[in-house]
Amino acid sequence: MAKKLYDVVALGEVLIDFTQNGKSAQGNGLFEANPGGAPGNVLAMLNNLGKKTSFIGKVGNDQFGLMLKETLEGLGIGTENLMLDDEVRTTLAFVHTFEDGDRDFSFYRNPGADMMLRADEVQEELIQSARIFHFGTLSMTHDGVREATKKALDVAKASGVMISFDPNLREPLWKSLDEAKEQVLYGLQYTDILKISDNEIQWLTGEEDYTEGVKKIREMKDIPLILVSMGKEGSRAYYKDMIVEAKPFLQKNTIETTGAGDTFCANILNYVLDNGLENLTEEGLKEMLTFANAAASIITTKKGALKVMPTKADVEEFLANNG
């Protein structure tokens, strides 16, 4: 059995989120280039919590790709399986923020380098050396990277590595929502920890009620721990026959919600790394959700996500003032 060098290894996308940042003297909109991408955000938060992480994926050998590599390394995230593509450029996302802080995305990814990761480029021993393997569905939208993701899942499962899945559905990146659903259902078959949003669970299961949705998912695969993030309604954990809910922390100074779900997810994984997945209690789950909700709330007051994740001390201080 490979030695567990890493707490979490994630496969997927790192990209540049261009977020609105005021206007120029000429009245033109200014955009700030923020390193992002859901799996990268998750690892950045975990690193802030003292966990050892590494990223599997591909960026362009261009100014943005090199910036992302440098950013990950600066945060202490392993890049031994971050590939550089000489042909295809780094994926870009333009984030349009609404007044309540929610957002919409326009992607420049036709193709983007993250889609070009091949199965033969995935380092099996890296996955085998992790306690948790984490993935999403941006790495399942197109053939090449889909095969890389499936290979990684097979390696993780065969090696007894715990598998965490956040579908993170981005509709514009799929040929059709039917194809998206097919790939999410494929991913569920491997999953030990599922983080899913309120909208995603309703879309996936056709159930308005989240508990009914969870029942449907568990009929397909008995996933031990399912987290439903409900935005302004807080979050829920479904563990064995327990349902635990925690209220949100709503900020007056919310700027945008980019990275909130990833921050939440990372804090859940951190709790599982510290406490295991076998004997979680109602009290422990409530504490886990409360901490994760608080961390997610903090990130909504900042532009971008990957480089500005809160520390454990930030979250503890926030809870002391808002608990």
Model-identified regions with their sequence ranges:
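Structural alpha-helical scaffold elements that stabilize or flank donor/cofactor-binding regions
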Residues: 125-126, 186-187, 219
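Glycine-rich phosphate/adenosyl-contacting loop at the front of the ribokinase-like
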Residues: 1-78, 117
